[in-house]
Amino acid sequence: MLRKLLLLLFLFSFVLLNAQTDQDSLWVRENYTKKEIYIPMRDGVKLFTAVYTPKDMSEKHPILMNRTPYSCAPYGADFSGRLTGSHWKYYCRENYIIVIQDVRGRWMSEGEFVDVRPFIKDKKANNDIDEASDTYDAIDWIIKNLPNNNGNVGVFGISYPGFYSTMAAASGHPALKAVSPQAPVTEWFLGDDFHHNGAFFQMDGFSFYSGFGKPRPKPTTIGPSGFDFKIRDNYEFYLQAGTLKNLAKMMGDSIKFWKELYAHPNYDEWWKARNARNAMYNIKPAMLTVGGLFDAEDCYGAWNLYKAIEKQNPGIHNKLVMGPWSHGQWSSRDGTRMGNIQFGSNTALWYQNNIEIPFFNFYLKGKGTDPNLSEATIFFSGENQWHNFTQWPPANISNQPIYFQPNGNLSWNKPTASKSSSEYISDPAHPVPYTEDVHFQRTAAYMNDDQRFASRRTDVLTFQTDVLNEDLTLAGPVVADLAVSITGTDADFVVKIIDVFPDDFSYPNSAGQQGRAGGGSYPMGGYQMLVRGEIMRGKFRNSFETPAPFTPNKIEKVKFDLPDVAHTFKKGHRLMIQIQSSWFPLADRNPQKFVNIYEADITDFQKATIRIHHDATNSSNIILPVIK
């Protein structure tokens, strides 16, 4: 009976949602006009641009711009779906002029596309172009040629368009008053999308670039097809693929950026030139960086772009918002949950109505009072509350190491044993999966998924505290400080921060809790919620520029940063740390032999014994940002 009621409620909500979408579509058609234009850049290349203009001529309107490599479709006369399928519709109700542009070399725009095109600081000629100069030229043309605009421009974008928003902020155009990079691609070697601390995120990279990276010899409205996967189990597909050399053969020879990845296995000047933070100096517009605590793609980018702007531009209007979201979830209609974890309210709608729209309204329309947002508006999972801070990381944190102990314990006290370690055998032929389920596409929910499946494996070390007697709140970056020894010459180290729920835990509406494949409610009692996980390719432990082998069986330090956290471990819960040496097929497998992994043969892959030391001299620990 309960399931029937839930089904009826779902169907009723679906009908209401579709009815609202139809109403929004009709309203936009009645109140907006669309035209498509080519805007010339300083080097003569023309960029295809869709412009949606309010019919209301009673006042001048601000311009909100989005530059994208993902197409400004629909092309031609149709337009309503673009403006009503997300929170664009709210800006239509505010009578914004909406401008969406295909970036250079993509879709209907002319020119050559370059991935994360490097910023040119000192431009000396018209051929010195980058995404900042293209944005400048587009804005300049728009404010001079679009009728009835008020001369104020804002730019925002999510993910790769977040990168173009970042570059817009560096354009220096005086009409650009407000910019919001959201889940911005910032650093593709250290933490965003395709590499994390030098480890290659092969699953995202291969599935994305097999389509996105295909050559586009001339402007087109037709998107490329992706790879034809014959195996729909991603673990099995990448295991059978074997090596990155084999993936390269599957990808073929036509995708330029894929070949460039292989040609630059270390953090060299080629990668450094593509660090978006290089452009974040002398920033003039008001900045609002937005990201998700559980963003699988660009969590790193949001945290670290904000910090770079803050450091390199003291005193400017630079704000940060981080909510409990997957990639771009804040632009959806629903932010009440992510995967199995519930947040107690519609966090996405709250953000749209209370932060983003008022931000642009004030700076572009002069509407309302100065939103005067807190420096950082951060949602804390665990307690499910928003908090405001005058700086990030907060001033009132204490970076406290929590130490691994014998018998799988965790303690704030340094271990006293003269010699103690825990070990496991890491076998590349049987890598640790990143999630329990069998599936094809990489899931978004792995970022807060249940880790009980990993706790049961012999190649995963698990350490946990006693039951907490009081709440423990973490706010800021986490540092893994490991003392390790290995029998090979290279290894990966995956560190996972986990919230262990009480055995009797359930949500009030647990009957409707999302289940695994096959239906049914998911058992939340004893849930091991991933709060933050990160991987470190061991050969980069001393330098990302110059990798170095391990000396077999020698104790060495492996210290690396995890992206910031904002989480409260509630009284009655436990804090758990898991350590493992594969995270498959999320990250490529380490052969556990010091080689160029992009060129490794299957014969290079070998088992290794990994030891994590926890004694008085070699005290492995995790440094946690504890709110005092």
For each feature predicted by the language model, list its residue ranges.
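Conserved alpha/beta-hydrolase "acid-adjacent" motif
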Residues: 296-303
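Bacterial Sec-dependent N-terminal signal peptides
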Residues: 1-22
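Cap/lid segment of the alpha/beta-hydrolase catalytic domain
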Residues: 59-145, 194, 332-343, 502-504, ...
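Accessory cap/linker subdomain of secreted extracellular hydrolases
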Residues: 84-85, 93, 115-118, 125-128, ...
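C-terminal, loop-rich substrate-recognition/catalytic regions characterized by aromatic stacking residues
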Residues: 229-232, 238-245, 321, 330, ...
